[in-house]
């Protein structure tokens, strides 16, 4: 090679090195995202999750007032990645037609959400584990636009603790004798090693199914009926004997275990029987099995050690959270989620990383309200892309991490004068207990909730509006367990202000979600709930018509949900936006079913280059045999019992 050529190569190498160095100044992100983990019933206690505290909480911070807004997996995961409430994504259920993989794609969510926004900022993105329930054996060839390397779990294997996973559209693999959380841990660690080797900033999400129930889909050979069966979570073999002395925390501040008097609760809750001793004993064991299944704690340790050995730990944000909360034995319930009560809405959120002051404490060091819709704006801001926040139609705002700034948090990280002190939650559909078969399902569990929290006084209020238009109001400072519905006894000013907030937040979009006071008080005189309680505003709030439902529906229909602010916030025809509920005709259902069957028959694996690092567990993996895969496709069709579900 001539001297000139050598010089040219050297120059190119120098430019590449400088570019690489500049690129790596951006922080990395590792998100560990569990399934159905509560923040109320002590699941994150250091006795049960010591690594969570050692490796994330003590060198970072826990947000004590962190909530989901739709407490069920797939809509909540969509809120997280899109930064929008479910009434703005119109992704409102786990399965079609109101949720599911096809609706996720049909709404265009996979065309514009957090992983793709980060890729546009020069990031590699990685994903392994639970994705959407309806991402299944019938459609796995359609690779989620979620990452450089994407390894989502595939239904009906998603909630099998002997898991199957696929990689970038290839046939799902079985991992004989391997435990789900261990497989996801090993593959997540391998992805991190691959990400570091690639030399670009990265976002890696690791989503174990724990501590979700173990779920099987089976066909009764005698009747031909296919249905799902829920069982308590299955711990890893070494963990079966752990925490045998653990009991449900009935003596906690909430004190709502097996609530005797539910006369002030909605009619459908009053219809639930009080748990008898045999069911209480069973629920105690469910609780212990949930604790024993928290293998993600070991995952945390492996992730931190991998980042440390790679020399990137100090430039990496590590986040731990869950898709929704969970209750065992609260009120009259058995085990599950989907209600508007605290057990289901509150989830853990812990973070460490550059710019965040170490708490070095067992006590939460940040009590600013945070929501899943705030997650995407937070990541963008930490990644140096806060300039994008106004371009993505986000309902959320960055989390209050500025309260824990060690002086090196990005200078453009938003620091609002007034942090969010109120939010809304919502759910559409029925209620059923996951594990107590004696509790009858209830069809009318569609609801909205508005919740406030004043960081200085610790005062919190909650108003729940059921689709039957029954109301519940709780003073959360005096009654954190939501035992005493004071709707008829509360001061009129408190009730009217909460009704006013709900009327705005139930239909909010964009800025009105984080700052409803701008709608209620356009002159800017009121910026929080405490100020709104001033008697001089009584006439304003007494004139506001309460939010109501016309009837109970299992889906979002703007004509069914009435607020006097709907036109002001959403325009004259809100159904024309993303929130449109599109009914399918019989002809379109048949066409969709035909197309889906054709797609499900495709067996050719997508071409894909090997990862830089392969998890050792891959040595044991084998593809799911085609005859079993075909049978499972038919089983999944039969389970859904409506062909357009798989559209």
Swiss-Prot record:
EC number(s) stated in the UniProt entry for this protein: 3.1.6.1
Residues annotated to bind Ca(2+): 35-36, 73, 323-324
PROSITE patterns: SULFATASE_1, SULFATASE_2
EC top class named in words: hydrolase
Principal place of residence: periplasm
GO biological process: phenol-containing compound metabolic process
List of glycosylated residues: 42, 90, 279, 444, 528
Keywords from the UniProt entry: Calcium, Glycoprotein, Hydrolase, Metal-binding, Periplasm, Signal, Stress response
Catalytic activity: an aryl sulfate + H2O = a phenol + sulfate + H(+)
CDD domains on file: G6S
Modification after translation: The conversion to 3-oxoalanine (also known as C-formylglycine, FGly), of a serine or cysteine residue in prokaryotes and of a cysteine residue in eukaryotes, is critical for catalytic activity.
Subcellular localization: Periplasm
Manner of cofactor binding, per the entry note: Binds 1 Ca(2+) ion per subunit.
Signal peptide positions on this chain: 1-21
Induction trigger: By sulfur deprivation.
Catalytic residues (UniProt): 73 (nucleophile)
Family note: Belongs to the sulfatase family.
Protein name: Arylsulfatase
Name of the gene encoding the protein in the UniProt record: AS
């Amino acid at each position: 090679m001539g001297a000139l050529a050598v010089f040219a190569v050297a120059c190119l190498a120098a430019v590449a090195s400088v570019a690489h160095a500049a690129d790596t100044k951006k922080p990395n992100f590792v998100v560990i995202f569990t399934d159905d983990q509560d923040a109320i019933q002590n699941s994150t206690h250091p006795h049960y999750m010591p690594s969570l505290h050692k490796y994330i909480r003590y060198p970072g911070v826990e947000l004590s007032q962190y909530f989901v807004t739709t407490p069920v997996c797939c809509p909540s995961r969509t809120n997280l990645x899109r930064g929008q409430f479910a009434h703005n994504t119109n992704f409102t259920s786990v399965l079609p037609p109101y949720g599911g993989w096809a609706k996720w794609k049909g709404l265009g969510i996979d065309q514009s959400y957090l992983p793709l926004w980060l890729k546009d900022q020069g990031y590699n993105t990685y994903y392994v584990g639970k994705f959407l329930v309806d991402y299944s054996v019938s459609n796995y060839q359609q690779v989620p636009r979620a990452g450089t390397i994407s390894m989502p779990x595939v239904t009906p294997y998603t909630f099998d603790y002997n898991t199957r996973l696929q990689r970038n559209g290839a046939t799902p693999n079985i991992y004989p004798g391997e435990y789900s959380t261990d497989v996801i841990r090993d593959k997540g660690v391998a992805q991190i090693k691959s990400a570091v080797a690639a030399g670009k900033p990265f976002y890696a999400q690791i989503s174990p199914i724990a501590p979700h129930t173990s779920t099987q889909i089976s066909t009764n050979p005698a009747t031909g009926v296919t249905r799902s069966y829920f069982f308590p979570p299955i711990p890893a073999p070494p963990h079966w004997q752990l925490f045998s002395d653990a009991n449900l925390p009935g003596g906690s501040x909430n004190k709502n275990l097996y609530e005797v008097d539910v006369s002030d609760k909605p009619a459908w809750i009053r219809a639930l029987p009080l748990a008898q001793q045999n069911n209480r004993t069973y629920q105690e064991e469910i609780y212990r099995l949930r604790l024993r299944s928290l293998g993600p704690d070991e995952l945390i340790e492996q992730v931190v050690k991998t980042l440390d050995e790679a020399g990137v730990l100090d430039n990496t944000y590590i986040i731990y959270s869950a898709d929704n909360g969970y209750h065992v034995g609260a009120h009259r319930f058995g085990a599950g989620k989907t209600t508007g009560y605290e057990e289901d809405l509150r989830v853990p959120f812990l973070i460490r990383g550059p710019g965040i002051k170490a708490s070095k404490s067992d006590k939460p060091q940040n009590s600013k309200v945070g929501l899943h819709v705030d997650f995407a704006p937070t990541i963008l801001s930490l990644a140096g892309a806060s300039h994008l926040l106004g371009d993505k139609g986000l309902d959320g705002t960055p989390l209050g991490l500025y309260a824990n700034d060690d002086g090196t948090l990005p200078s453009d990280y938003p620091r609002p004068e007034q942090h969010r002190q109120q939010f809304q939650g919502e759910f559409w559909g029925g209620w059923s207990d996951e594990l107590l078969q004696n509790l009858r399902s209830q069809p009318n569990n569609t609801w909205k909730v508005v919740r406030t929290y004043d960081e200085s006084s610790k005062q919190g209020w909650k108003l729940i509006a059921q689709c039957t238009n029954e109301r519940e109001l709780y003073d959360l400072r005096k009654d954190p367990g939501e035992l005493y519905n004071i709707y008829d006894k509360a001061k009129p000013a408190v009730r009217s202000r909460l009704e006013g907030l709900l009327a705005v937040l139930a239909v909010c979009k964009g800025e009105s979600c984080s700052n409803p006071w701008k709608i209620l008080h356009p002159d800017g005189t009121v910026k929080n709930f405490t100020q709104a309680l001033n008697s001089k505003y009584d006439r304003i709030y007494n004139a506001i018509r309460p939010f109501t439902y016309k009837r109970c529906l299992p889906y979002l229909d703007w004509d069914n949900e009435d607020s006097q602010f709907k036109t002001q916030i959403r325009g004259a025809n809100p159904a024309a936006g993303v929130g449109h509920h599109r009914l399918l005709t019989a002809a379109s259902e048949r066409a969709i079913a035909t197309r889906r069957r054709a797609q499900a028959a495709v067996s050719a694996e997508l071409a894909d280059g090997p990862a830089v690092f392969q998890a050792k567990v891959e040595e044991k993996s084998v593809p799911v045999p085609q005859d079993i895969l075909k049978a499972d496709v038919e089983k999944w069709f039969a389970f859904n019992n409506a062909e357009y579900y798989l559209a």
